[in-house]
Amino acid sequence: HVRNHFGSKPHKCGKCNYSCVNKSMLNSHMKSHTNVYQYRCADCTYATKYCHSLKL
């Protein structure tokens, strides 16, 4: 938590200039570099990389 106050972002993406405070944020960001859409709507053909995109 303290890193948030000092601006330290030790976790860096190897594919772009993104950096963040914790590893879980980096893991989520790395999905943006893939073509995998693992979350699918049960009612239509919509698919997304992020599960929160399916929630109302």
From Swiss-Prot:
One Gene Ontology term, aspect cellular component: nucleus
Key word Repeat present: yes
InterPro entries linked: Znf-C2H2_CTCF, Znf_C2H2_sf, Znf_C2H2_type
Keyword Acetylation: no
Pfam family, one: zf-C2H2_16
Alphabetical keyword list: Developmental protein, DNA-binding, Gap protein, Metal-binding, Nucleus, Repeat, Zinc, Zinc-finger
GO MF terms, alphabetically ordered: DNA binding; zinc ion binding
Top-level taxon: Eukaryota
ZnF (C2H2-type) residues: 1-5, 11-33, 39-56
SUPFAM superfamilies on file: beta-beta-alpha zinc fingers (SSF57667)
One of the protein's GO biological processes: segmentation
Subcellular location: Nucleus
Main localization category: nucleus
Matches recorded under SMART domains: ZnF_C2H2 (SM00355)
Family per record: Belongs to the hunchback C2H2-type zinc-finger protein family.
Described function: Gap class segmentation protein that controls development of head structures.
UniProt name for this protein: Protein hunchback
Gene name, Swiss-Prot/TrEMBL: hb
